[in-house]
Amino acid sequence: MAEVITEYRNENTKDIDLLSTIDMVRKMNEEDQIVAKVVGEEAPNIAAAIDVIAKAFLKGGRLFYFGAGTSGRLGILDASECPPTFSVDSTMVQGIIAGGEKAIRNAAEGAEDNFGAGREDASILTEKDVCVVISASGNPKYLLGVLEKADEVGAATIAVTCNSKGHIAEDAGLVICAEVGPEVIAGSSRLKAGTAQKMILNMLSTGAMIKIGKTYENFMIDLKAVNEKLKDRAIRIVSQIAGVTNSEALAALL
């Protein structure tokens, strides 16, 4: 197996089990400060990925996130927020997790080792689509199967990882590698690695939607007003852009 940085022991937290609760929290927060800086260093690669995704959207393509465990759940989370935020069809951005729907709530640890399942799940891809594989370690065989199938159909491939020595970093067309270092608890990649992945996915989907015109300035002008909070937001957006009262904005929206 390739070297896995996320499995290393963090020298800064060796005594975490002996700390007071407040010192434990401060130690975790200290480690979290690393994440934003490391993600920022990947800005050029993130920007390149956004341009690839936006170009695919404009040509009728879709964005697929593939991952196992925490990484898969983060992909599903990001995908699920796109329809209400940007008023896009639920098929435009999709998250797929190793092990299927049941793995969203319950750990399916062995699923990440299934190369064939990755190929099968990736059979949904076409040459118009973008395939983003997400993994802290960069080594799940499931994702290697996804990448192999994606290459066969001609889909663009992007790896989001925290390990430059992982296999997906070798196989993907574009790599975003946020090496956040060893976790507070050795191997618990839901922590710093998961935070880094969430930040990156936020930028990928939001950036691509901005590029295809889903915002005006920094307003989400294509939102679906499906609840009271979003209806109120729609009124405020129209009011601020048009320079009218909330009542006038509401009347225009009805």
Regions found by a protein language model. Give the residues of each.
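A short, well-structured juxtamembrane/interface segment
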Residues: 41-56
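Internal, active-site/partner-interface "lid" segment
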Residues: 206-241, 246
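Small-residue helix-packing motif on alpha-helices
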Residues: 249-250
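Cofactor-/ligand-binding subdomain signature composed of acidic, glycine-rich
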Residues: 1-38
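Short, glycine-rich nucleotide/cofactor-binding loops
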Residues: 35-44, 133-140
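Gly-rich Lys/Arg/Thr-decorated short loops/hinges at beta-loop-alpha junctions or inter-strand turns
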Residues: 29-35, 95-105, 216, 234, ...
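Glycine-rich phosphate-binding loops that contact phosphosugars or nucleotide phosphates
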Residues: 64-199, 208-212
